Amino acid sequence: MKLVIAEKPSVGAAIAAVLGANEKRSGYFEGSGYLVSWCIGHLISLADAATYNEQYRKWKYDDLPIVPQDWQFTVANGKEQQFSVLKDLMHRSDVSEIVNACDSGREGELIFRFVYEQANCQKPFSRLWISSMEESAIREGFSNLKDGRSYDDLYQSALCRAKADWLVGINATRLFSILYHKTLNVGRVQTPTLTMLVNRDYAISSFKKEKYHVVRLDAGGVSALSERLNDEAAAQQMKAACEKSQAVCTSLKKEKKTVAPPKLFDLTALQREANRLYGFTAKQTLDYAQALYEKRLLTYPRTDSKYITSDMQDSTKELITGLCSLLPFMQGVKLQADLTRVCDNSKVTDHHAILPTAEFLKAGFSSLADSETKLMTLVCAKLLCAAAAPYEYEAVTAVISCGGYTFTVKGKTTLCEGWREIEKLSRAASEEQDEDADPETVLPPLAEGQTFDNPAAEISERYTQPPKAYTEDTLLSAMENAGKEETPEDAERKGLGTTATRAGIIEKLISAGFAERKGKKLIPTKDGYNLAAILPEVLTSPQLTAEWETRLTGIAKGSDSPDDFMRSIEEMTAGLVKTYSAISEDKAKLFTPQWEAIGTCPRCGAAVYEGKKNYYCSDRACSFVMWKNDLFFQQRKKTFTKAIAVALLKDGKVKIKGMYSTKTGKTFDGIVLLADTGGKYVNFRVEQNRK
């Protein structure tokens, strides 16, 4: 009997169906000599600090740095039952071999190995490495299973990444949170991303616009522009000279240019385009793509490749033929598919580019939600564009001389629409306009030496423009390219984060209060500015990630030492703690809320502030919190107002009128007491004579 372990339940179900394991059990499928189960993502993770020492529950500078000598693991909250299922299956006497069917890549390897180690399993295991959930891909993968131990170096690379992130995250977060009296989440990827937002916002806010002038010359149906002029008097002089002179075309340059078809989508490119065209957040795009993948309509979405392999050319051309028949906007379009530009075995590591599946050709759009339809259309259109002919046009640059000054005008004329025809048709079908689209300007017939009498000149006043605020589209691009020049070509990961994690990083910055969305824009908050300002460059620069990826790539290849890498991380962490041992009193107040305290915490004496959903103690080490939706007040049909909270904190009691009695169905007036016993929840009780 073989036990197959997938990363997610939906993937496990798909594999079970292909293998004929059709008997549904609790947490797994069985049949045809197979048991098929799943991990529910990261089922096992590195244990938190308190697991090593109970005193670490309280954050104290004297305990830093926290460096485990014997790393421990823990089952993720809410996933204990599934781990128990896997452990029991691994130790079943009739199971002779295990197949690691988790996602093909560094993290997928880590997910399986953590479960394998935590279950103390010693049985041999093999590796399933596939990029599509189609039946044919699964069957082919099982006929070519790899030796699981041949991926040991990849696992060591993944393990080092996890431990290093734990060490830096735990210690840096505690260190700066202790110093500044506020929980400040610090991470190797999150912090440099925040810094990019801060730097861009600062560049915008500190930008000083400068006025300049441009003279437009209208001659023979052509509008040519002068160079930028900072002096208005010079512009007036140019205008006056031109209006008295004859204009002459002194130079006419025509150049045929070709724009190659676009590459296929990896996840980041798909997220960027979906944000630009539809306003989808990166997380929304990932969620929609994952749902389509689980429906077998889309190939694996968390890929960082924009290419396919040579053995996929025939099947991909069949896809293209099917799409031309399926998609209404392709009716009447003649497409001679050429996949040469997107076929490169060397640029496909874990997974190939995102593609529609053969299953999609059968199912179509009928069962899809609007958001899924939009995303699926983008993927289909990108494949068709990638296989189409290049876009060809003639670029024309004319120089017009007049009154001793020169003016330039540029235009272009399309010679062959190529892939742009498909892009335009797909955009029109979805009624979406690409704001970044380059408009076509066709110039009237011109010739060198051609003269124009009575030209008109006009001065326009313009201003220099500040940089644009980041959108998720442009931030994803910046994350993808950050530190690339310092990262080796063959590194598994480049830039900040991965195709799969960048969306989560953006969401974390927003939920932690360090950034916010304003329309499509991503803007840092005041706390975001302050956090970026107080942290050392080693934590705010992408360089750390670049250095790590260089080392982790070496470990995955077996050319670098995991022990040496971890030793360097421990030294860096210890150096941070030693360097930042104390700060001034003024700096310690950087993150103090601007609003007034509503009272004093009855447990620790710190200030209590009002939040959106609660009244909470400002000392993060104290667990005192009063929830606005507390059942005590809901049952009595009273709103837990700020005035009530103030009175309870000041006097320990408050008189409230018109409380509802669930026993009598009537209202009454009474005194509510703050009956705090120091536990997880704050209690209240009524003490009064009912009227």
Segments predicted by a language model, with ranges:
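Intrinsically disordered, low-complexity regulatory segments
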Residues: 1-162, 166, 466
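Conserved short loop/turn motifs at secondary-structure junctions
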Residues: 1-3, 101-104, 181-183, 254-263, ...
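Basic, low-complexity terminal or inter-domain segments flanking catalytic cores
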Residues: 2-3, 79, 90, 173, ...
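Amphipathic alpha-helical transducer elements in NTP-driven molecular machines
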Residues: 9-16, 33-36, 40, 76-87, ...
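C-terminal or mid-to-C-terminal helical accessory/interaction module adjacent to the motor/catalytic core
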Residues: 137-219, 254-258
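Phosphate-rich ligand and nucleic-acid binding surfaces
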Residues: 223, 253-254, 324
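Metal- or metallocofactor-binding catalytic centers and their adjacent structured scaffolds
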Residues: 232-265, 271
